[in-house]
C-alpha cells in the first residue's frame, strides 16, 4: 500500500537508492500495490550513474510491507517497500534486479523484470 510521500528502496542497479512516491498512476487510485506504476522522485543516488538525485522517474512496485492476498487465500508480505525504475515502455532502466519479487508482476506483463529477478515468490 504505497501512497504519495512513501519512501521506497530501489531494487535495481540504475543508480538510485531511495525513491519517494509522488503520484500513483492509473485513474483515481489512492494507493499502489504490487505491480502498479508510480511516479517518484529520487531521494538518494550513487554518484556517476544514469539516474541522479532529484530526477523524476517512473517505477513499478515489486515488494510491499502490506500483505497482499492471492486467489488461493495465501497472504504474501515482504520486509520492505521496493520498486524497480522503468522507462515509458515499462522496461527496466537497470540491468539487474536485487531481492525477490512477487508473482503478481507476471499478471501485469512485466516479464523483463521477472526474468531479471533472482527469485519470484
Swiss-Prot record:
CDD domains: Ribosomal_uL14. InterPro entries: Ribosomal_uL14 (IPR000218), Ribosomal_uL14_bac-type (IPR005745), Ribosomal_uL14_sf (IPR036853). Keywords: Chloroplast, Plastid, Ribonucleoprotein, Ribosomal protein, RNA-binding, rRNA-binding. GO terms for cellular component: chloroplast; cytosolic large ribosomal subunit. Signal peptide: none annotated. GO terms for molecular function: large ribosomal subunit rRNA binding; structural constituent of ribosome. GO terms for biological process: translation. SUPFAM superfamilies: Ribosomal protein L14. It is found in: Plastid, Chloroplast. It comes from the Eukaryota. Gene3D superfamilies: Ribosomal protein L14 (2.40.150.20). The keyword Ribonucleoprotein applies. Belongs to the universal ribosomal protein uL14 family. Binds to 23S rRNA. NCBIfam families: rplN_bact. Part of the 50S ribosomal subunit. This is Large ribosomal subunit protein uL14c. It comes from Nephroselmis olivacea. The lineage of its organism: Eukaryota, Viridiplantae, Chlorophyta, Nephroselmidophyceae, Nephroselmidales.
Amino acid at each position: 500500500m504505497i501512497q504519495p510521500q512513501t519512501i521506497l528502496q530501489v531494487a535495481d542497479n540504475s543508480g538510485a537508492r531511495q525513491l519517494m512516491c509522488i503520484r500513483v498512476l492509473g485513474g483515481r487510485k489512492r494507493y499502489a500495490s504490487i505491480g502498479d506504476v508510480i511516479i517518484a522522485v529520487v531521494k538518494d543516488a550513487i554518484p556517476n550513474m544514469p539516474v541522479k538525485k532529484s530526477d523524476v522517474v517512473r517505477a513499478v512496485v515489486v515488494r510491499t510491507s502490506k500483505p497482499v492476498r492471492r486467489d488461493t487465500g495465501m497472504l504474501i508480505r515482504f520486509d520492505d517497500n521496493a520498486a524497480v525504475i522503468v522507462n515509458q515502455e515499462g522496461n527496466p532502466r537497470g540491468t539487474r534486479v536485487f531481492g525477490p519479487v512477487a508473482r503478481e508482476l507476471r499478471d501485469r506483463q512485466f516479464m523483463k523484470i521477472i526474468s531479471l529477478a533472482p527469485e519470484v515468490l
